[in-house]
C-alpha cells in the first residue's frame, strides 16, 4: 500500500517535490497526511487558488444567526471556515508583503474591490484585517454615508473581517476601532459592538485616545447607547479638558452633535458650550454645508438663543452654500432660522435664486419649509410665492396634507395672490374635495381661514366646519375648544355674513363665538405699536383740542378692536366719545406699526387687511395711519398737519 502510494505520487509530475517524496519514503502510509501536510500546503494553495475560494465560499455561505438577529457570527461554522484559516498560526506574512497588501487596499475605490481582494487572501493578520475594515469605512464616508450599506454588512467576507477583529480588538488601531463603531448599523447589544466598546473604554481610561478619536467615539456612543451611557459621560469629561485649538473643524461639529444627544444636561455643560460657541466663530469659514446644517440643528436642540454672533456668522456662510445643500440640510437650516428668528436680505435673495433654479424639481418638503420660513419671518418674496404656486398647481399629488397646509397658509398670512390665483385655489378646492378626511380638523381650519383672509372664501366647506360633528372632531379629547380655533371659526362666520350673503348653510352657534379677536396669547389682530400710538394721541389732542373727542382701544360689537375711534354727527362734526346719541359716522383710525406689514414693505398682513375690509363693510370710515408715513414727519407741527389732512381732506365728510 505504501509502495503503491509512493509510486503513484512520484509518477505525477506536479507532485515531484523533494520534501513530499522524502516524507513518503520515510513515513508509513498511515502517517502520510501528517507528514506531508506542511509541505503540500504551500503547493496546494498556489496550484489551485480557485479550489480554495470555492471552499471558502461554501464555508461562509452558511446563514448567520443570533438571538437578536444582528450578531456577525456564523451558525454551524465548519472547521475550515475562512476565519479559521486566517487564524492558523502557521500562516504569516512578511512585513514587506503586509505593507504591499496595505498599499493595494488603499488603492481600491469601492466596497466590492476591497472585499474581492480580501476574499483571495490565504493569510489575514489582524493588522491587515483592521486596515481592510478601515478602508471600507473610508469609502463609505467618501460617499457621504456615515453608516455602511446593508449589502456590505451582509457580505460574508465583511462578516468574517468583523469576526477576526472582534476576537482580538486590542490589536486594532484607535482609528480603526472608532471608525468601525461609527460605521456599523447593528444591534448595540451585539457581541461585536460590546467587544469594541469595551476596548474603547479600556483605552479611554488609559487616556490613549486622541481628540478626533474621542469625537468619533462620542458620536457613536450617543447613537448606539444614548445619553445615559456612562462611557459617553467620560468622553464628554475628557473633551472638556482638551484645548480647543487642537480640534479640527469636523471635531467641533462632533462636539455639538455629542452634546445635542444630551439636551437634558445642557445646563451642566453650558460653560463648555459657551467656550465652544465662541471658538466656533473662528472655524465657520472652514465648515462644509453638511457641517453647517449639523451645527445649526444642534444649536436648536440645545436652545442656544444667546449665541447670536455665531448664528449671524453661520447665516453668512449659508448664503454661499444654498445651491450645495441637500434637501434635508436646507430644510434643517430653514427650521433653525425660524427657531432663532434669523433672516437677512442676502439669504432671501439666494433662496429666491435657488427656488427659481430648481422650479419643478424642488422637493415638496423643501418647498413647504421655504414657505413656512417666509411666513414666520413675514417675508413676502413674490418670486418664491409665484414659483411655489406654479409647482403646486402642476404637482399637487406630490404634497402631503401637512405640506399643503404649510404651502397655502402663507398666501393668506402675507396677503398675497399669485398671478395664477384662480388655478391655485381651484386646485386647493379639488384636493380638499378628494382628500378632506386626510386633513386633521385644526389643520383644515387653518387652511380655510387663511384662504378667507385673501378673499378666497371656502363657501363649499363652511357647512362642514360649522357642523356639530366638525366641532366635536375639533375638540377631540380635550374638555374645551382652544381659543385660537374658536377665534378662527368666529372670523369665518363673520366673513360668511359680511362677504358671502348668498351662503344659507349652518351658522356658528353664539356659544362658540369669541368676544374679541385681540387676546394676548392667540390673537387674530396685531397689537398697537405703543410708541406710534403715543405720538398720534399727542397730535390728535393738538388737532381736536381735547382728549374728550376720541376714544382708544375700542372693542366693537363685531369682535374687532379699533385703535382710535372718532364719532361724527350727521353734519360731520366731531362728537365727544361719551356721546352715543346722534352718532352718524364712526371713524376707525388704524395706527399701523411695522408688525402689521410684511417685513420691510408697505404691504399689510392678511389679518390686518381682513380687519379693515370688515370694518368698512360694517359701516366704519377707516383711516389708515401707517408707520412709514409717520416716520417722515420731523416735528409736532408736521404731525398735526398730517392728521388734519388724513381726517379733514376735501373728500371727507369730517368737519373740524
From Swiss-Prot:
Cellular compartments annotated: Mitochondrion
Q: Name one GO cellular component term.
A: mitochondrial matrix
Question: What is the superkingdom listed in this entry's lineage?
Answer: Eukaryota
Annotated RAP domain ranges read 587-645
Which Pfam families is this protein grouped with?
FAST_1, FAST_2, RAP
Membrane spanning segments where? none
Entry-linked InterPro entries: FAST_2 (IPR013579), FAST_kinase (IPR050870), FAST_Leu-rich (IPR010622), RAP (IPR013584)
According to the UniProt entry, its GO molecular function terms are: RNA binding
Q: Determine if Transit peptide is one of this entry's keywords.
A: yes
Q: Which Gene Ontology terms describe the biological processes this protein takes part in?
A: mitochondrial cytochrome c oxidase assembly; mitochondrial RNA processing; positive regulation of mitochondrial translation; regulation of mitochondrial mRNA stability
Keyword line = Mitochondrion, Transit peptide
Q: Does the keyword Acetylation apply?
A: no
Role description: Required for normal mitochondrial respiration. Increases steady-state levels and half-lives of a subset of mature mitochondrial mRNAs MT-ND2, MT-ND3, MT-CYTB, MT-CO2, and MT-ATP8/6. Promotes MT-CO1 mRNA translation and increases mitochondrial complex IV assembly and activity.
User: Domain comment?
Assistant: RAP domain is required for FASTKD3 function in mRNA stability and translation.
Which family does the similarity line name? Answer: Belongs to the FAST kinase family.
- What is the recorded name of this protein? FAST kinase domain-containing protein 3, mitochondrial
From which organism does this entry originate? Rattus norvegicus
The UniProt gene name for this protein comes to Fastkd3
Amino acid at each position: 500500500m505504501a509502495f503503491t502510494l509512493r509510486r503513484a505520487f512520484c509518477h505525477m509530475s506536479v507532485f515531484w517535490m523533494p520534501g513530499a517524496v522524502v516524507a513518503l519514503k520515510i513515513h508509513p502510509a498511515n502517517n502520510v497526511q501528517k507528514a506531508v501536510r506542511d509541505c503540500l500546503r504551500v503547493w496546494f494553495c498556489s496550484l489551485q487558488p480557485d479550489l480554495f475560494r470555492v471552499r471558502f465560499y461554501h464555508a461562509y455561505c452558511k446563514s448567520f444567526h443570533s438571538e437578536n438577529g444582528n450578531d456577525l457570527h456564523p451558525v454551524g461554522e465548519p472547521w475550515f471556515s475562512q476565519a479559521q484559516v486566517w487564524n492558523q498560526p502557521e500562516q504569516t506574512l512578511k512585513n514587506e508583503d503586509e505593507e504591499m497588501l496595505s498599499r493595494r487596499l488603499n488603492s481600491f475605490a469601492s466596497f466590492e474591490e476591497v472585499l474581492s481582494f480580501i476574499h483571495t487572501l490565504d493569510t489575514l493578520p489582524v493588522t491587515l484585517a483592521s486596515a481592510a475594515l478601515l478602508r471600507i469605512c473610508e469609502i463609505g464616508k467618501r460617499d457621504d454615508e456615515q453608516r455602511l450599506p446593508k449589502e456590505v454588512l451582509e457580505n460574508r467576507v465583511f462578516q468574517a473581517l468583523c469576526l477576526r477583529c472582534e476576537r482580538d480588538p486590542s490589536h486594532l488601531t484607535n482609528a480603526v476601532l472608532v471608525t468601525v463603531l461609527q460605521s456599523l448599523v447593528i444591534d448595540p447589544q451585539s457581541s461585536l459592538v460590546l467587544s469594541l466598546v469595551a476596548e474603547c473604554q479600556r483605552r479611554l481610561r488609559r487616556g490613549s485616545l486622541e481628540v478626533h478619536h474621542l469625537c468619533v467615539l462620542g458620536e457613536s456612543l450617543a447613537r448606539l447607547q444614548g445619553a445615559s451611557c456612562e462611557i459617553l459621560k467620560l468622553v464628554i469629561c475628557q473633551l472638556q479638558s482638551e484645548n480647543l485649538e487642537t480640534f479640527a473643524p469636523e471635531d467641533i461639529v462632533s462636539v455639538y452633535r455629542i452634546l445635542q444627544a444630551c439636551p437634558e444636561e445642557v445646563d451642566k455643560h453650558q460653560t463648555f458650550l459657551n467656550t465652544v460657541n465662541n471658538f466656533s466663530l473662528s472655524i465657520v469659514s472652514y465648515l462644509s454645508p453638511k457641517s453647517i446644517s449639523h451645527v445649526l440643528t444642534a444649536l436648536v436642540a440645545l436652545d442656544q438663543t444667546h449665541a447670536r454672533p455665531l448664528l449671524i456668522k453661520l447665516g453668512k456662510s449659508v448664503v454661499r452654500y444654498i445651491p450645495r445643500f441637500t434637501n434635508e440640510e436646507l430644510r434643517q437650516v430653514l427650521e433653525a432660522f425660524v427657531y432663532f428668528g434669523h433672516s437677512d436680505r442676502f439669504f432671501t435673495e439666494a433662496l429666491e435664486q435657488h427656488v427659481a433654479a430648481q422650479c419643478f424639481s424642488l422637493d415638496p418638503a423643501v418647498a413647504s419649509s421655504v414657505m413656512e420660513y417666509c411666513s414666520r419671518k413675514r417675508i413676502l418674496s413674490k418670486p418664491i410665492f409665484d414659483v411655489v404656486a406654479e409647482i403646486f398647481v402642476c404637482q399637487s399629488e406630490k404634497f402631503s396634507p401637512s405640506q399643503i397646509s404649510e404651502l397655502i397658509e402663507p398666501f393668506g398670512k402675507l396677503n398675497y395672490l399669485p398671478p395664477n390665483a384662480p388655478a391655485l385655489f381651484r386646485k386647493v378646492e379639488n384636493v380638499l374635495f378628494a382628500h378632506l378626511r386626510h386633513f386633521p380638523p385644526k389643520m383644515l381650519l387653518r387652511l380655510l381661514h387663511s384662504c378667507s383672509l385673501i378673499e378666497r372664501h371656502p363657501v363649499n366647506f363652511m357647512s362642514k366646519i360649522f357642523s356639530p360633528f366638525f366641532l366635536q372632531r375639533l375638540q377631540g379629547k380635550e374638555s374645551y375648544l382652544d381659543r385660537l380655533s374658536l377665534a378662527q371659526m368666529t372670523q369665518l362666520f363673520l366673513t360668511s355674513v359680511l362677504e358671502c350673503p348668498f351662503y344659507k348653510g349652518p351658522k356658528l352657534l353664539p356659544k362658540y363665538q369669541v368676544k374679541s379677536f385681540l387676546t394676548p396669547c392667540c390673537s387674530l389682530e396685531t397689537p398697537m405699536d405703543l410708541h406710534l400710538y403715543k405720538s398720534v394721541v399727542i397730535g390728535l389732542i393738538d388737532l381736536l383740542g381735547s382728549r374728550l373727542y376720541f376714544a382708544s382701544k375700542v372693542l366693537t360689537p363685531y369682535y374687532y378692536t379699533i385703535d382710535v375711534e372718532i364719532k361724527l354727527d350727521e353734519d360731520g362734526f366731531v362728537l365727544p366719545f361719551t356721546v352715543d346719541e346722534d352718532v352718524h359716522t364712526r371713524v376707525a383710525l388704524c395706527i399701523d406699526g411695522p408688525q402689521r406689514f410684511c417685513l420691510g414693505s408697505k404691504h399689510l398682513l392678511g389679518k390686518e387687511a381682513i380687519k379693515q375690509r370688515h370694518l368698512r363693510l360694517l359701516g366704519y370710515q377707516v383711516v389708515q395711519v401707517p408707520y412709514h408715513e409717520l416716520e417722515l414727519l420731523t416735528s409736532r407741527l408736521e404731525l398735526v398737519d398730517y392728521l388734519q389732512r388724513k381726517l379733514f381732506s376735501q373728500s371727507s365728510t369730517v368737519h373740524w
